Amino acid sequence: MKALDELIFDNRFARLGDAFSTSVLSEPIETPRLVVASQSALALLDLAPEQADLPLFAEIFSGHKLWSEAEPRAMVYSGHQFGSYNPRLGDGRGLLLGEAYNDAGEHWDLHLKGAGRTPYSRMGDGRAVLRSSIREFLASEALHALGIPSSRAGCVVSSSTPVWRETQEHAAMVLRLAQSHVRFGSLEYFFYTKQPEQLKTLAEHVLTMHYPHCQEQPEPYLAMFREIVERNAELIAKWQAYGFCHGVMNTDNMSILGITFDFGPFAFLDDFDEHFICNHSDHEGRYSFSNQVPIAQWNLSALAQALTPFISVEALRETIGLFLPLYQAHYLDLMRRRLGLTIAQEQDEQLVSQLLKLMQNSGVDYTLFFRRLGDQPAAEALRTLRDDFVDIKGFDGWAEAYLARIAGEGKGTEQERQTRMHAVNPLYILRNYLAQNAIAAAEKGDYAEVRRLHQVLCTPFTEQPGMEGYAQRPPDWGKHLEISCSS
């Protein structure tokens, strides 16, 4: 394991030149304090755990100090926001400090969010507030623990620096780790500004650095795009299967790697509601829970447009057409596993859709239903869960079909089924009210709850003694919390 001053940098994106990013130094925040750190994320850099306890750690990730090999850059990109094209966005408050590589040869971007003003800040102050930084940290690490591809979060550092949003708050910085920060909107920018050479350079960078195996194919860019489609189909299937709502699926928030990226007004479902909108600015529900699948396909079409100089329109359309069947296959596989089933059958889609309809009509807690279904032998669990449903007759019909489905598989014991289900059905998820409790304490200078919640979320499938309070439905005040893009 390494000390902070032993990180090795190889800043490949910075070497692309000033057309792709701008050299900017961070604006430090005052009296920095470490709020929370993720040892598993920092281990990606081979950093020793005790490094987070050093004063130097908070100084670096609050903008006060910098490695001599780092080359902080603000990246330029554009994007479709709520369906409308915005020609110039870019890192308005974040900096790509550099790319460090570990002993395994993996490159990781170190991106400091809340690092101050850049040429792309427009009218903003370049700051991130403590609450949004904590939310991004917790979401990144919670999704990773659930097995959902995501950028990682190394730490959050707080400060006494005041910033104004709806009220006065305090600035913070969050360290984001990802193997690339290239977005769909990065390629869109060079396509729509008619910079073909720069577009080709960026496309080659993505292909060479992140999809090198595609170079062996007859049409490398088509092979790369197909893999991007495949990765996004699997990603969105996991979002839907685990009840995650992103909230702002603009193309500038879509990673070229097919990972969850740029956390804003996200939420996990409490009660199952396919029409759930987690962003109170999304008045038309464009990014509602049920719309995430078609929006992901729409975003892939937007990316495809930027790739037309390299791939035929016909091939792009054919590849985009693979998204829905790939998504459906991944989603049904995940839902089978959540139900403890091991064999695919034609009626599985109906079994899942009927259950979700019953849950929708009864306001059943999405996460706890699946967990409790695996807590007992199936017949006993169904009798216990029956009281949660308004349509008792409908639920009894579904339960009968489910029991017949289990019996038809004839594989293993009830205990084996329960073990399988507990391995894929979390007991703990990042509910908005849990995040809000942690944020409220942190804003008073108490970081113990943020750290405790982080530790609970790191092992979501394992029951943790004394942590029963983190596996409860939200109290009345915690239901339907409205989260804005203000951060």
Curated annotation (Swiss-Prot):
GO molecular function: AMPylase activity; ATP binding; magnesium ion binding
EC numbers: 2.7.7.-, 2.7.7.108
Annotated residues for binding of Mg(2+): N253, D262
Protein encoded by which gene: ydiU
Keyword field: ATP-binding, Magnesium, Manganese, Metal-binding, Nucleotide-binding, Nucleotidyltransferase, Transferase
Catalytic activity: L-seryl-[protein] + ATP = 3-O-(5'-adenylyl)-L-seryl-[protein] + diphosphate; L-threonyl-[protein] + ATP = 3-O-(5'-adenylyl)-L-threonyl-[protein] + diphosphate; L-tyrosyl-[protein] + ATP = O-(5'-adenylyl)-L-tyrosyl-[protein] + diphosphate; L-histidyl-[protein] + UTP = N(tele)-(5'-uridylyl)-L-histidyl-[protein] + diphosphate
Residues annotated for ATP binding in this entry: G90, G92, R93, K113, D125, G126, R176, R183, D262
Top-rank taxon, per record: Bacteria
Active site: D252 (proton acceptor)
Functional description taken from the UniProt entry: Nucleotidyltransferase involved in the post-translational modification of proteins. It can catalyze the addition of adenosine monophosphate (AMP) or uridine monophosphate (UMP) to a protein, resulting in modifications known as AMPylation and UMPylation.
Upper lineage: Bacteria, Pseudomonadati, Pseudomonadota, Gammaproteobacteria, Pseudomonadales
Protein name per Swiss-Prot or TrEMBL: Protein nucleotidyltransferase YdiU
Family classification: Belongs to the SELO family.
HAMAP family: YdiU_SelO (MF_00692)
The species this protein was found in: Pseudomonas savastanoi pv. phaseolicola (strain 1448A / Race 6) (Pseudomonas syringae pv. phaseolicola (strain 1448A / Race 6))
UniProt entry tagged with the keyword Transport: no
Cofactor: Mg(2+); Mn(2+)
Top-rank EC class of the record's enzyme: transferase
InterPro entries: SelO (IPR003846)
